C-alpha cells in the first residue's frame, strides 16, 4: 500500500503521514521513507530480472524528466537531478523501469542500456547520440514531437488563414491515420501497409520540407518546427523499416506521466 500510495497515486509522504494520523496511526514520514528504501533493496533481484527482459526487447522507449532532490549528498539542493524511464515489452508483459541520476550526460543512457542491440525511441536530446553510435543500435525519433511543434506554429498563424503549418500537419495526420488503420494487423501487414501508404506521404512531406526550410526564419515557431523535422528526418521515417517499430515515443511519455504528477505534488524527492 505504501509504494502504491506514493508512486501510483502520487501522494507525498507528508500527506500520507497526515492521512494515517487522522485514523489514529502515528508513523513519521522518516519511517515511511526508510520502509520504501528497504522495499527497494528487497525488490532489487526482481528489478534485475526486469532489466534483463527489457534488454531483450527489439525496441526500447526512452525519456527523462527533471526532479529536485534536497537531500542528495552529492549535489547542491537547488540543482536539478533526472529521472530516466525505459519502457518496452509486449502489451501483456510490459516492462517500465525508472532510474534516478544527478546527471543528464550521455554516459547515463550508455550505462542503462549497456550491451543493448536493437532500436531506441527517443526525443532529439543530444545525450542519446553516443548510444545511437553503438554497434547494432538504431535510433528512432518521435513523430508526436514533430506534430506538436507544428501545432504550436499553427496557433500563431493569422486567424482564419491556412498556412505552412497546416500543410505539414495534414500530411503528419495522414500518417497517424494509416497507423490507426494498421493497428490491429500483424507486423508483416503493418510493414506492407506502411510501404504502400506511408512512404508516399513521407516522400511528399520531405519534398515540402526541402522546399520550405530555406523560406522560414529559423528562430520563428514555424522555423523551429521545420528544423526539428529536417534535423531528425532519417530517424522519423525509420519506423517504416519494420512493422514492429513505433511511430512515436508516446509509450515512454505515458509511463513517465504518473511520476510527473507525483513531482507536481511534492516539494522535493
Language-model features, listed with the residues they occupy:
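Catalytic center-proximal scaffold of phosphoryl-transfer enzymes
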Residues: 1-269
Amino acid at each position: 500500500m505504501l509504494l502504491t500510495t506514493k508512486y501510483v497515486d502520487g501522494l507525498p509522504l507528508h500527506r500520507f503521514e497526515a492521512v494515517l494520523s487522522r485514523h489514529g496511526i502515528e508513523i513519521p514520514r522518516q519511517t515511511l521513507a526508510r520502509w520504501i528504501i528497504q522495499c527497494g533493496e528487497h525488490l532489487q533481484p526482481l528489478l534485475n530480472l526486469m532489466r534483463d527482459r527489457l534488454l531483450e526487447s527489439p525496441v526500447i522507449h526512452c525519456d527523462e524528466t527533471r526532479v529536485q532532490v534536497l537531500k542528495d549528498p552529492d549535489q547542491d539542493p537547488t540543482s536539478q537531478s533526472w529521472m530516466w524511464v525505459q519502457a518496452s515489452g509486449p502489451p501483456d508483459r510490459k516492462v517500465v523501469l525508472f532510474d534516478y541520476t544527478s546527471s543528464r550526460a550521455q554516459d547515463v543512457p550508455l550505462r542503462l542500456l549497456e550491451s543493448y542491440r536493437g532500436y531506441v525511441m527517443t526525443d532529439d536530446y543530444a545525450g542519446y547520440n553516443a548510444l545511437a553510435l553503438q554497434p547494432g543500435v538504431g535510433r528512432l525519433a518521435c513523430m508526436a514531437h514533430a506534430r506538436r511543434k507544428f501545432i504550436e506554429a499553427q496557433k500563431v498563424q493569422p486567424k482564419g488563414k491556412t498556412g505552412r503549418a497546416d500543410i505539414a500537419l495534414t500530411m503528419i495526420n495522414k500518417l497517424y491515420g494509416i497507423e490507426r488503420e494498421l493497428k490491429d494487423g500483424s507486423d508483416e501487414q503493418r510493414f506492407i501497409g506502411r510501404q504502400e501508404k506511408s512512404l508516399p506521404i513521407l516522400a511528399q512531406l520531405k519534398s515540402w520540407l526541402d522546399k520550405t526550410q530555406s523560406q522560414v526564419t529559423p528562430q520563428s515557431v514555424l522555423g523551429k518546427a521545420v528544423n526539428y523535422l529536417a534535423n531528425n528526418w532519417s530517424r522519423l521515417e525509420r519506423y517504416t523499416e519494420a512493422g514492429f517499430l513505433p511511430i512515436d515515443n508516446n509509450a515512454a511519455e505515458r509511463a513517465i506521466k504518473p511520476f510527473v504528477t507525483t513531482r507536481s505534488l511534492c516539494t522535493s524527492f
